C-alpha cells in the first residue's frame, strides 16, 4: 500500500476491483488542509479513463506487477516499442503513456521500466530525472530580475517545461519526470 502522495505516473493501482494505470498526478497543497492529489487514470481492462481525487495520506493499493528494464526503440503509430537487454520487443499504447510521451525521443538511452499485466505491456515508468535539449524558448526579458523569473520552453520530444529565465535554445536541462518541473541546466 502506498499513500496517494507516493503514487507516480506509470504505477498501476487497484481501484473498485479493477487495475488502473496512473497517467498523470497533480498535487495541490494549501496552508490549512492536507495535500490533495488528483490522479488521471486509465482502466487496463475496459480501456476507459477517469480522474480521481484523494487526500495525500489516503492509502491506495499499488499492484506489484512484472516490470522489466527496457530502452525506447521506435514509434509505430499508435504504439511505442521498447526493447529489453535480450532484444525482446514490447508494444505500449500511446494512450497508456500519458505525459511521459513528451519525454520520449529517438535515440534516448534512458532505461525505462515497462510494466506488464497478464502478459501485456500496459505502462512505462521513466527515470525520475532526465536530460533534454531546449529547442525553443523566448529570449530573456532584459531587466526583469524581480524574484524567480520563469518562462515556457519546448524540449526535444515536443513537451513544454517552465524553465528559469537564463535558459536558452540549445541548452540541456534536467527535468523531474514525476512533476514535469525544470531542475537545473546541465
UniProtKB/Swiss-Prot annotation:
One of its GO terms (cellular component) is cytoplasm. It holds the Pfam family EFP_N. GO terms for molecular function: translation elongation factor activity. The keyword Protein biosynthesis applies. Pathway: Protein biosynthesis; polypeptide chain elongation. It is found in: Cytoplasm. Keywords: Cytoplasm, Elongation factor, Protein biosynthesis. GO terms for biological process: peptide biosynthetic process. It comes from the Bacteria. Its main location: cytoplasm. Coiled coil: none annotated. Involved in peptide bond synthesis. Stimulates efficient translation and peptide-bond synthesis on native or reconstituted 70S ribosomes in vitro. Probably functions indirectly by altering the affinity of the ribosome for aminoacyl-tRNA, thus increasing their reactivity as acceptors for peptidyl transferase. Belongs to the elongation factor P family. HAMAP family: EF_P. NCBIfam families: efp (TIGR00038), PRK00529.1 (NF001810). This is Elongation factor P. It comes from Shewanella frigidimarina (strain NCIMB 400). The gene is efp.
